[in-house]
Amino acid sequence: MGPLGRETWAQRLGTFRASPSAFMAGPEGEDLGRDLLSDLRSEKLSEPMKVALLALSLEYPDQLWPDAPAAEAAATSLLDTLVLLPPRPSALRRPLLLAATTALAAGGALNPASGASGRLLPLLLGLASGRDLGRSFCPASEQRPLQATAWECLRELESCRPGLLGGCLGLLRALLGREGPAQPLSLLLALALRNALVIQARAGAGLQGLLTAGESSMEGGPWNWMLAEEGEVHLQPQAPSWPAAEEDECGLAALELSPEEARELRATVAQLLDASYLLTPVAQAQLLWLLGWALRGLRGQPPVLFKPQLVRLLGTAQLTLLHAMLALKAAFGEALFTAQDEALLLRRLTLAAQHPALPLPTHLFYLHCLLNFPENWPLGPTGEEAAPLLLGSQLCRGLLPSLLHEPMALLARLHLLCLLCVEDEEKEGKGQDRSPRHYLEELLAGLRQRAALDGGPRALATLCFQASYLVAHCLAGQPVVLIPLTQGLAQLYRARPALAPHFVDLLDHVGPELQEPLRVALRQEVASRPGREEALRWHLQMLASVADGDAQSATLSFLRAAAAHCTDWGLQQALLRVCRALLRAGVGGGLADLLQELARQLEDPDGQDHARLYYILLAHLAGPKLGVALGPSLAAPALASSLVAENQGFAAALMVQEAPAPIRLSVGPRRAEGAVPVLRLQVEVLEPVYSLELRFRVEGQLYAPLGAVHVPCLCPGRPTRPLLLPLQPRRPAPARLAVRALYSTPSGLTCHAHLPPLLVAFADLFLPFPQPPEGAQLDFFEELWDSCLPKGTESRLWCPLGPEGLEALVSRHLEPFVVVAQPPVSYLVAIRLPPDSRLLLRLEAAQADGVPVALRTDDWAVLPLAGDYLRGLSAAG
């Protein structure tokens, strides 16, 4: 097949970028790489199109060259194309160099046995050193850009194979002295130097003259493949944190340098640092990272080499440079920073963080630096925050958190406030009016007050619990803070029991300093307030988490009172989970009486079976065996006794086990008929199920409770009828249905599973009015139209139309509700919305791109829902 045209390539590239994995799995994926390499030599394609093809190979080398042989062949072809370019200026030389380098590095083909590596490395080194390769390779005008590209390619190869350029250190150092402070060359030398120091230290060898050796003195070329093999662990050139101290002790500290090598190393580092101010801020930061890592822990190399850079950068406004400077502070400490330097830097960070015009990410960065400033680290016992050495309340007065701050900024400022609270008692003794601890208590009270708003946003509750966890973590050893925190959280639960899942999660993550008193407070709160029926499930969920052997009588009294209100399966299961928790806690006699009462009182057979099983276990097993029987079954060891195994299977058969959902439910096409809206559910069967019962719960109070749907049997591969779920809306609004399945498996086990929630759309509630007599349709509609006012409302909007026009849109979405039709430009539509609302539409004078719609309804809350529905009709198709 001949070369592809420009339009064909543009289409293929667009399809590939839309989904690379799908394209490569298709019929054209296998030939994409081969066609790309072939058409790079075609004279029919323009250079911009060839550059676009090379850009694709740079972005997706793993998809184009998935293994080492393919990468080797691709790099060879790219190098051949580079050599065959005419000597005139071309925009392809630099992308070809980058593409060949990327193919070898990403495909794992960079090794001494690779022919493409043997061709590419000398070419890159020749270009990097400025050696004249002849006018036949490239014109003089391209030599300088190609040299910079060669430096970048060598840095990429050194990053992939640390130690590869260890033999080129002397050459690169001499080249830096000759070429001046070129940014890619400086970064290349710094990376190669860092890698060589780390690898030689692990090998227990010195630098062995690597800093002074020239290219002519190297046997077998400048490529140190042995050093690269020893450095197979890929080192991050800009690591987010410094190596651990124990790594230094067995790493760079073991490097033995001769006096001459130490002198040459200092000269090389000084050479790089002295000209670093000419680099971009990002490049300067990376250079400081590399050199700081290389010299940290290296004996005989004082960090005073960085002092001129420190003086220069103390006033920097560049975040990357500030971050690198703080890394040097963490690495070298007092050996590099004086007390005056630390105070100045801390004051700069504090004042910068208070700037009112800072973007949120920058503000969070400054706060992060303050929180991780070495002199602000905790100095007390493990797990406790101690007084910071330099950070004081006067300095941080402008950084105190407020309820008006963004959540992330509030939490960061709160962490800073916790650092200051450890000195609270001392400053209170000196007569301070408003201590940090008092400010902290007021802030937490404000967060709890916002979280207690019934129906408030979930984000406010989440922020309150995040702040509570942060305070408990930072001030675990401060009872004066934890006691009011515990009391406040108990009051929050009293005001809004629906936050029970948040409380359970908090109890799972906090330490015992807050966990134990909070458990007691919440247990007392639940036991003393049975609550209304809608709050009962939250009380039971909370009690299942906090119940133990203490306060047995109050807990059992609460459960007896709650049992009368547990009428559905979900509440009964929640009640039994509390009983299970009490069983594991070792609660005795009173629980046995309660279980007997539940076995007689509960209406659901599953709940009765559970109550009887728990009573039998309590009556016949001692405490340790009872704990094992009620423990998780997944970690149970295999038992050799067939009798015991049979008993285990019998116990499992009596219990309802949670399992992955065996079916998938989706909402099918609706039919506007009947007295109530009916949701048609499509079923996809994954596993055979028997006696399936689907239970639906509406989130919120928008709908009346929904009945269960029963199906005797479902098997994969057999056609299934849609399941009909009648809806009883209390208000005409969309809803979200939580779905739970209870079923039997072919092996006889009873299981339950949670299915993904179902969404009831606004249009799923549409019902038609009774058909008026023939000839009376217009009068019927006008009577409905007039009856909506004055108690209702009306509006007008523009409904965009697709290319098929108004007639097709009405036929597809509104045909059952049309009362009067004058196609294709006018329709009168009447929709009945349960329980007792109506929505009337006049679609008249349709135009090519849309139709004006007049709406009337007797329920003003329907208006925004109707507007959203109409505006989305054209997009729905």
From Swiss-Prot:
GO BP: endosomal transport; protein transport
One cellular component term from this protein's GO annotations in UniProt: AP-type membrane coat adaptor complex
Pfam families: AP5B1_barrel (PF21589), AP5B1_C (PF21590), AP5B1_middle (PF21588), AP5B1_N (PF21587)
Keyword Ion transport in annotation: no
Record's keyword terms, sorted: Protein transport, Transport
The keyword Transport belongs to this UniProt entry's keyword annotation: yes
PANTHER family tied to this protein: AP-5 COMPLEX SUBUNIT BETA-1
Function: As part of AP-5, a probable fifth adaptor protein complex, it may be involved in endosomal transport.
Subunit structure, interactors included: Probably part of the adaptor protein complex 5 (AP-5), a tetramer composed of AP5B1, AP5M1, AP5S1 and AP5Z1. Interacts with ZFYVE26 and SPG11.
Name of the protein in its database record: AP-5 complex subunit beta-1
